[in-house]
Amino acid sequence: MICLVLTIFAHIFPSAWTGINERTFLAIKPDGYQRRLVGEIIRRFEKKGFCLVALKIMQASEKLLRQHYIALQDKPFYDRLVKYMGSGPVVAMVWQGLDVVKTARVMIGETNPAHSLPGTIRGDFCIDVGRNVIHGSDSRESAQREIALWFQPDELVCWQDSAERWIYE
């Protein structure tokens, strides 16, 4: 119940999602799921010290995907992207931690895998921009919008990470 209240509070006061409480939305795309990269991707974020507060495997509807990628609706690849994202299971996740939005983007790598450094998810596992394994929110604002789009407030789990004192000063 406390978690639900905190989540609703965070929707009303976005500044509540800062510091070690910052949250981001990540989605392992159908290619990442089919290639069995889910465990490896989760492992990387856990080893970094971030907390997984929500996860679900789902077949995303066209309506959800069109809302999710609304900012890209004028791009020539928009319909192809929506069709591709609906072609198989997606692993939707919410991660929490200090500067998680920015750090997750660094860990993921560039949108075009050819520009991604080794050690990043896309640098290690991707070749083609159209099959780049994972989506990550690009700002706190988009993270809040995407989390609200993919998850109900009661699906976000608040928990105290016993390793937190070993991660944050």
UniProtKB/Swiss-Prot annotation:
Which cofactor is recorded for it? Mg(2+)
**Gene symbol of the encoding locus:** nme3.S
InterPro entries assigned: NDK-like_dom, NDK-like_dom_sf, Nucleoside_diP_kinase
Q: Name one GO molecular function term.
A: nucleoside diphosphate kinase activity
Localization of this protein: Mitochondrion outer membrane; Cytoplasm; Cytoplasm, Cytoskeleton, Cilium basal body
GO:BP terms for this protein? CTP biosynthetic process; DNA repair; GTP biosynthetic process; mitochondrial fusion; nucleoside triphosphate biosynthetic process; UTP biosynthetic process
Which Gene Ontology cellular-component terms appear in the entry? ciliary basal body; cytoplasm; mitochondrial outer membrane
In the record, the note on similarity to other proteins reads: Belongs to the NDK family.
Known partners and oligomeric status? Homohexamer.
Q: What class of enzyme is it?
A: transferase
Q: Report what the protein is called.
A: Nucleoside diphosphate kinase 3-A
Which Pfam families does its entry note?
NDK (PF00334)
Q: Which organism is it from?
A: Xenopus laevis (African clawed frog)
Enzyme active site: 135 (pros-phosphohistidine intermediate)
EC numbers on record: 2.7.4.6
Knocked-out gene: effects: Morpholino knockdown of the protein in the embryo causes pronephric malformations.
Q: Could you tell me what reaction this enzyme catalyses?
A: a 2'-deoxyribonucleoside 5'-diphosphate + ATP = a 2'-deoxyribonucleoside 5'-triphosphate + ADP; a ribonucleoside 5'-diphosphate + ATP = a ribonucleoside 5'-triphosphate + ADP
Query: Which residues are ADP-binding?
Result: 29, 105, 111, 122, 129, 132
Q: How does it sit in the membrane?
A: Peripheral membrane protein
Description of its domains: The N-terminal hydrophobic region (1-17) is critical for mitochondrial outer membrane targeting and phosphatidic acid binding.
Principal subcellular localisation of the protein: mitochondrion
The protein's UniProt keywords, in alphabetical order, are:
Cell projection, Cytoplasm, Cytoskeleton, Kinase, Membrane, Mitochondrion, Mitochondrion outer membrane, Transferase
Tree of life domain: Eukaryota
Which function does this protein serve? Answer: Catalyzes the phosphorylation of ribonucleosides and deoxyribonucleoside diphosphates, other than ATP, into the corresponding triphosphates with ATP as the major phosphate donor. The ATP gamma phosphate is transferred to the nucleoside diphosphate beta phosphate via a ping-pong mechanism, using a phosphorylated active-site intermediate. Through the catalyzed exchange of gamma-phosphate between di- and triphosphonucleosides participates in regulation of intracellular nucleotide homeostasis. Required for ciliary function during renal development. Independently of its kinase activity, facilitates mitochondrial tethering prior to membrane fusion through its direct membrane-binding and hexamerization. Implicated in repair of both single- and double-stranded breaks in DNA, independently of its kinase activity.
